[in-house]
Amino acid sequence: MAEWISKTLGELTSFISKGIPPKYVDEENENTIRVLNQKCNRNFEISYNESRIHNAAVKKVPENKLLHSGDVLINSTGTGTAGRVAQIFNIPMPTTVDGHMILLRPTKEIEPLYYGYVIKSYQKKIESLAEGSTGQTEI
C-alpha cells in the first residue's frame, strides 16, 4: 500500500505570476491573442465572453504567461472580486491574463484537477487577504 506524501502548495506550483499590461485592439488577426480579465472569472469558471484582444506584435507576451490547461486564475484586485478562483482547461486560442489576475501553474507531480480543487477550497481565505480602501482592494 502506498503512503501519503505531504507537500506544500509552493512545492506543487511550478509558476506563479500576475498577468500582463495589455495593448488592446478591436479586431483579431494573426498577431493577436486573447486576454482574460476579472470579468471572465465568476462562480469558479472562466468565460471568454468578456475577454479582450491584445496586439502581441506591439507587446510580446512571455511564453510562460500563455495559459496552459489546468492553470488556476485568481482575481487580484477590486472589492467583491479580489480572491475569486477559477481553473481553466478549455483554451480554444492563445490566451493570457491581464495584470489584475494571478496565474498559478501546477507541477507535473500533481493531478491538475486536484490542484484546482485545493486552491478553490481556500477561496474565502484568499478573499480575506485583500487589503485597501475605496474599491481599490488588492491581494
Residue ranges and their predicted role:
Residues 25-27, 64, 93-94, 137-139:
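Short secondary-structure boundary/capping segments
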Residues 1-20:
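Non-catalytic DNA-recognition/assembly elements of restriction-modification systems
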Residues 5, 31-34, 100:
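A generic secondary-structure signal marking the coil-to-beta-strand transition
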Residues 37, 59-122:
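A short beta-sheet element
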Residues 10-13, 23-58:
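DNA target-recognition patches
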Residues 87-89, 130-133:
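Short amphipathic beta-strand starts and helix->beta connectors
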Residues 2, 20, 94-102, 131-139:
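A short glycine-rich beta-alpha junction/loop motif
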